Structure formats: C-alpha cells, structure tokens
Amino acid sequence: MEIRRRPPNPSVKVAHLQYAIPHADAEPRHILEKIVWEKDREVETARQRVPLETLKSQIADLPIPRDFIAALRQASVAPAVIAEVKKASPSQGVIRADFDPVLIANAYAEGGASCLSVLTDKSFFQGGFEVLVEVRQTVGLPLLCKDFILTPYQLYQARAAGADAALLIMAILSDQDLTYLSKVANSLGLTVLVEVHDAEELERVLNLGGFPLIGINNRDLTTFETDLETTETLSKQFATRLKQQGVLLVSESGLFNRADLDRVQAVGAEAVLVGEALMRQSDVCAGLKQLMIGDEGTSNS
C-alpha cells in the first residue's frame, strides 16, 4: 500500500499579499493517508511551539526507560497483555465517554497488564502527549507511545512525555525511514515496536533485521476492519524467519476474549495489544482479568 506524503502548497506573492495554490493531488485517497497528512501538519505546529532543544533538555532530567520487552517476557499470564488507553478511533468514534486516563491506567495495572499503550494522536483518536504524561505519573509499567510517527521530533516528544517504547508503522514508512527512526529511538533508550499489516511489510522488516519486537495488526488500515486470520497467516508464513531472528510477536486489534487470545497464541504470538474491548468495559480491571483468564479461570501460562 502506497502512502503519499502531503504535497506542498506553493505560495505566490502578489503585491503585499501571499496566496497558497492548492496542489493537484491535494486530497488524501483514504483514511490512513488523511491521518499521515494531518500528522505532518501537527508536527510542524508542535516544532514551532516546543523547539527540539527544549525537548532534549526535558529528556536529560528523566530516568532511563523501562525494559518493554523484558516486561512482556516476564508476564505471569500468556500471552502478555499490552492494555491500551484509548478514548476514540476513526472507525468507532468515541469509545469511552467517561475517559479518565489515570483511573484507566490504575485499573490496568491492578488487573495484571504487562505494559500499557497510550494513544497520543489528537485529531483522530482524541489522545495527546499530555495523556501520556498523566499515565506516566500514575503507573510504573512500561509505556508505549502509539502514534503515527514520521519524524525524529515525535520520538523526542514521546521520550519527553515518559514513553519507554514507540510504535513505528511499516505502512507509512520507507525502509530508510524505519532504519533511521529506529536508530534515533534506540539513542533515546526507546524500544521500537514495528507494526506490519501484510506479507510485504513483514518481509521488509525481516530483510532489514535487528527488530526484536514486531506487531501484526489485524486491522486493515484502509478500511479499519479486523480479521485475526492476518496474524495466523503471517505468523505461519514467516515462522522460521521470526524464530531465527528471535522476534517477540505481538498480535494487535480485533481481540475481544480469551478465545481470541488462545487463537493467536497458538500460532506464536507471545503478546497481544488490546484497546477497544477493554475500553468498552464498565469495570476495566475486571474486564482485563476476564480477558486474560477466561470463563474457566485458566490460561496458557
């Protein structure tokens, strides 16, 4: 899937007035491209408001990041759960109206989550780096900054807000971009979770090598529909190479109960990332425990 970056609007100055001329390809073709274009605008604005040097200064005073992968491997229940703090999504709209990230994070920690994922995208998920800061101040679990990261600046934002890991989405990055951004992330002490959606993307990541944490997203980012068969198909197709590279495999999206967890664990997923299913629970802590243990009170630990 090709994702075009937002085309520049050349400006023309007439007398003392300056006009921007819309580019011929000024309309995004699908929701993912729309998100990427909006993210470019967000980052431009953020750079002007908070210079990179300011972020570097903030990071200098922070403790070293927590070990995200170790937390997943040490989970008491298998597969390990990365529980997501998410208010809304483009496909579902507002998922939790009474959204309180502090209460949710505490409930996840009490419920047995190994790590947390925090949405920091404002325009489409109603998240923000301020939410990440709140969660960081609340729990000691490793935190994943989940966003559409296109630039090193965003990695500095994530680290300054307290993230221990960052999501890099293969669908919106070239091989060169992924390699560069992962080096920046590593220099900041951030673990990288590389997200793929199809065989072509997973092939690219494995060809590059050096990525011990890979997530298979069961959601089609052009339609936002989910299908657990995505994890099943890709994990089987690339089983040998994933094992050779020592990859910890995460299954993301479309997971709603213990049967779903068993299904992806059976094909090699050592961790799952779950958001919507938990955000819709009136009792998030109880919902997480139910998800991990199931109706019979057993799990494949």
Curated annotation (Swiss-Prot):
Keywords: Amino-acid biosynthesis, Aromatic amino acid biosynthesis, Decarboxylase, Lyase, Tryptophan biosynthesis. GO terms for biological process: L-tryptophan biosynthetic process. HAMAP family: IGPS_B (MF_00134_B). SUPFAM superfamilies: Ribulose-phoshate binding barrel. Gene3D superfamilies: Aldolase class I (3.20.20.70). Signal peptide: none annotated. It catalyses: 1-(2-carboxyphenylamino)-1-deoxy-D-ribulose 5-phosphate + H(+) = (1S,2R)-1-C-(indol-3-yl)glycerol 3-phosphate + CO2 + H2O. It comes from Prochlorococcus marinus (strain MIT 9303). This is Indole-3-glycerol phosphate synthase. Pfam families: IGPS. Its EC number is 4.1.1.48. One of its GO terms (molecular function) is phosphoribosylanthranilate isomerase activity. The gene is trpC. InterPro entries: Aldolase_TIM, Indole-3-glycerol_P_synth, Indole-3-glycerol_P_synth_dom, Indole-3-GlycerolPSynthase_CS, RibuloseP-bd_barrel. Pathway: Amino-acid biosynthesis; L-tryptophan biosynthesis; L-tryptophan from chorismate: step 4/5. Belongs to the TrpC family.
